[in-house]
Amino acid sequence: MRSILLVAAAVSLAVTTARAEPACQGRLSGKVTGTFTCDVTLTEPGDGEATFVVQPRGPIPDVPAYAPGAFRVPLPVRAGTLTLDDLGMGKASVAAEGGALYTATKTTGQRGEVTLILREAKPDPGRKGAWIVHGTYRARLIPAGAGKQGDVLVEVTF
């Protein structure tokens, strides 16, 4: 009986620990470094495209500002790989100490690189127009101003 209670306690602790881990984790490397936890959403506001957003949960020490990424995703949403060529308008940006800004964007043109891999994408039964997604997001941000060198990689697992 005692061993059953110990096993039950160990399983309960493992489940509690697993739930405490954020489902979305990100990392910056290159000219700006750091790690962050985040939330990922993929919603369809009713205009013919979905919106993918990586929303950080807090600041990164020594990083003045960062927005890991928000891009439009073509419908229908499904598992697969999307690059900046496939995605709609959007932006990822990281500001470095000293004023340098690194971006990957798609507006009328493109800069930087973005790869979004959706391993799983299924409608969220609790929220109309939303999907539950799992996968990876990677963006290579390049300097926005003249005279700056290097790049920043944003890597997110969700």
Predicted regions and their residues:
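A broad, structure-centric signal for solvent-exposed, well-ordered loop/edge residues
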Residues: 7-8, 35, 125
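Acidic, glycine-rich flexible loop segments
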Residues: 86-158
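Hydrophobic h-region of N-terminal signal peptides that target proteins for export
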Residues: 5-18
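An ectodomain-focused feature that recognizes extracytoplasmic/extracellular
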Residues: 20-113
